[in-house]
Amino acid sequence: MPPRKAPAKRRSTDSGVERDRGALSQEKKDQRIALFLSDFDQQAKESIREMKKELDLLLQMAEKAFMVELLKMPTAIRKMKRKDLLNLQEGEEVALAAAATDCALEDVPSPKVTRTNSKKVKVTTIVEYEDAKYTSTKKIPKKVSKSKSLVSLSSGLNSKLHSLSRSVYSSTSVNEAVKTPASDCSATNFKAMPKVSKSAGLQQAVSRTVPTSERVQGMVLRSKSVPQDKMVPFVNIPLADGQTLCMAGGDLRNIDVQLLNQDTVQHIHNLVVSLNQQTCIPTHSSTLSCEINVPGADSSCVFLLRLRNTSD
């Protein structure tokens, strides 16, 4: 029988590659686990932070509610010690609770309606006054509160316009009455009459302060008190009570200037300066009639001045 051959050694199919793959897969697993744990730690920390924030908010709300309840309690209970409060008997606790509720109701301030000053708006309306020979425009400022309605504003403006229209009518009647006594003057007097119309704007402002009946009465008295002699200077000053102060001739030099208002003296000075600066005064003897509105010492008044101009 032939001898058996020894079994040949098998070649190992493991060349070391499988070990490397196993080591790499194990490292990847370790890395994934480490990343998962770190992510878990971060999420846990974030959740803890959110819970702390919510807890802080709850504590703040509790403190605010506690402070509100303390403010509702009377001062005596707030100053009381905890031991004294705990040692109270049942009856005293009931009385204390009732007193606390009463004080809480009494401490609540009753609502009071207060009215504050509203802002004022300055409204400016322009009203035109028409005369036969001259037209003047006057601005009338009026302060109206914001709280007022538009109806009240329009009614106030209508009443103001109505009163102004009456003053214009009365001022034109006064102008006509002033022109009548001077109608018998020379032709140069008619040339000087436009000065009367130029002062209509001032006269309208005066006519608003004096009633219509008093203005008509003063106009009649002025027309009667005019001296017959055209060459004599005169001054008529209507007073606040309806009477008229008449001065003519030498009495004009005896006027006490201290009794007049400072504005009156200034207006008279301006009148004299304007008359001295005129260059179109006729050379022959004539009488110059003019009218000027001057505020007096106690009320508004009208000066009628008749000046004589004589040539050399």
From Swiss-Prot:
One Pfam assignment: Borealin
GO biological process: cell division; mitotic sister chromatid segregation
Principal subcellular localization: nucleus
Record has NAD as a keyword: no
Stretches with biased composition (Basic residues): 1-10
Residues spanning the signal sequence: none
Region: Disordered, residue numbers: 1-26
InterPro entries noted in UniProt: Borealin_C (IPR046466), Borealin_N (IPR018851), Cell_div_borealin (IPR018867)
Family: Belongs to the borealin family.
Subunit structure: Component of the CPC complex.
Role this protein plays: Component of the chromosomal passenger complex (CPC), a complex that acts as a key regulator of mitosis. The CPC complex has essential functions at the centromere in ensuring correct chromosome alignment and segregation and is required for chromatin-induced microtubule stabilization and spindle assembly.
Name of the featured protein: Borealin-2
Native organism taxonomy: Eukaryota, Metazoa, Chordata, Craniata, Vertebrata
